C-alpha cells in the first residue's frame, strides 16, 4: 500500500512503544510538549486551571491538550509529538551518551517559541537535534516529492508568494495540510532539500 504522510501518534505508540497523554501544560500555552527519560513528577493544569501533578515514567510524551482540539494546529501538534519522540529515539540509540547532563536528565520541554525564533545561534544542541530529526521523519524527501507531484507543483518551487503567485501558494498550502505540517515547517524542510528557492510566508 502507498504511504503519503507520516502519522506521529502511530509512530510513537506502535513503533516506539511510548504513551501519549494530552493535558494543559502551562497557564499561557507556552509549553507545547514534554517528556523525560526517567521517573519524575511534573506540574500540569486541570481544565479550570487548578494545579495538578502528573507522574512521568520515562516512556510518556505529554502534549498540550489545546493542540488536540483545533484542526488549525494539526501541524504544530504533529511536530510537537515527533519532537518529543525524537528525544526518546536518541535515548534509545545512545543510552549512555544522550540525556546524561543535569539539565537534560530532567524534563525536556518543547516551547511555543521554539519554532519561530529567528536566531541562527544554536544554544541547546539536544533541542536542535530533536527538531532536525523530527523534521526528517515527518517530511522525508520521498513523501514531499510525491506530494508535489500530486498537487501539480513540479520538481521545485522557485518562489512562494501569496500575492504574486497565488495558484502556486494555494497548491502549496494544500500540500502542507495534506502532509500534516505547518506551511513554515514545510518551507524550511523543502529549502534544506533544495525543493524550494524562495519563500515569503512571513512577508507576502
Predicted regions, residues:
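Active-site hotspot residues in diverse enzymes, especially metal/ion-binding acidic/histidine motifs
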Residues: 1-204
Amino acid at each position: 500500500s502507498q504511504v503519503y504522510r507520516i502519522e506521529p501518534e502511530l509512530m510513537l505508540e506502535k513503533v516506539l512503544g511510548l504513551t501519549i497523554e494530552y493535558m494543559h501544560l502551562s497557564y499561557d500555552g507556552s509549553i507545547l510538549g514534554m517528556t523525560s527519560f526517567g521517573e519524575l513528577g511534573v506540574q500540569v493544569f486541570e481544565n479550570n486551571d487548578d494545579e495538578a501533578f502528573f507522574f512521568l515514567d520515562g516512556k510518556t510524551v505529554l502534549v498540550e491538550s489545546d493542540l488536540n482540539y483545533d484542526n488549525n494546529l494539526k501541524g504544530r501538534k504533529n511536530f510537537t509529538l515527533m519532537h518529543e519522540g525524537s528525544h526518546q529515539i536518541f535515548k534509545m540509540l545512545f543510552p549512555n551518551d544522550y540525556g546524561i547532563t543535569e539539565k537534560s536528565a530532567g524534563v525536556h520541554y518543547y516551547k511555543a517559541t521554539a519554532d519561530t525564533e529567528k536566531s541562527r545561534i544554536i544554544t541547546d544542541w539536544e533541542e536542535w537535534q530533536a527538531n532536525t530529526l523530527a523534521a526528517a521523519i515527518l517530511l522525508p524527501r520521498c513523501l514531499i516529492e510525491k506530494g508535489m507531484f500530486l498537487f501539480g507543483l513540479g520538481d521545485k518551487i522557485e518562489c512562494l508568494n501569496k500575492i504574486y503567485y497565488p495558484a502556486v501558494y494555494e497548491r502549496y498550502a494544500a500540500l502542507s495540510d495534506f502532509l500534516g505540517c505547518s506551511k513554515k515547517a514545510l518551507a524550511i524542510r523543502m529549502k534544506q532539500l533544495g525543493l524550494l528557492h524562495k519563500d515569503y510566508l512571513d512577508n507576502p
